[in-house]
């Protein structure tokens, strides 16, 4: 029987597919819909110290090749999501989950993580270092010195499993520099990638979203080559103990297969989930299993990271 089961840190998952933070995860009802689907897990909306309304609407638009958004981190506050995942972990039948968080400053991020450290939650945390859509707030993971300083502080007190969501990098030297920093810390995973920041989509003569004069994060088909490159570059450079979650441009089993071939242990779905709903996990899982069966692969480990190069 072909299996799409996988593992991140000490946590086992029946399926390698899940949602991406920001999609189908704002409310408890949405999270329960992902929980009830074929997805192996869910990640919550990125929770901030206080609830946020986010940017003015319209702030999301589908396009022929994906999507553009400038949501601005709307969420119910980290405590809302922490309560949900803490309650769900009491159920033996529950899946393991990811709690996504970030502060609007380094100090706020530490406040949140210290609260999680002191809580009963034992699951995975995804620290979002890469939101491109908050006006006046840069993507922290592009500042290597600041990222290093923040991780150094965090791991001086935080002992639970923690990973980071990264923006896309485009320069080989940046992969080298980032990996050198990440390898210094006991990260459970890195997630490659968040949307490509500050794209522009135009309808006739006008931008399609309102915030930031129409500038927003690009997702979907547009970003798959960039996402695959980031997954594989970090797979080549990171300590084996740091797993990789692949995110970007996944709407078929073939897309998921390519992420895993590049080194991903799990695969998140964003734009396509927004367009198709939680039933997408059943479809993509079957498509992935069919590809694996056709190639004679029984488990993800049979081909994960085995990308072939031209001789």
UniProtKB/Swiss-Prot annotation:
Gene3D superfamilies: Aldolase class I. The keyword Cell division does not apply. Its EC number is 1.3.98.1. The active site is at 131 (nucleophile). Pathway: Pyrimidine metabolism; UMP biosynthesis via de novo pathway. Catalyzes the conversion of dihydroorotate to orotate with fumarate as the electron acceptor. This is Putative dihydroorotate dehydrogenase A (fumarate). It comes from Streptococcus equi subsp. zooepidemicus (strain H70). The gene is pyrD.
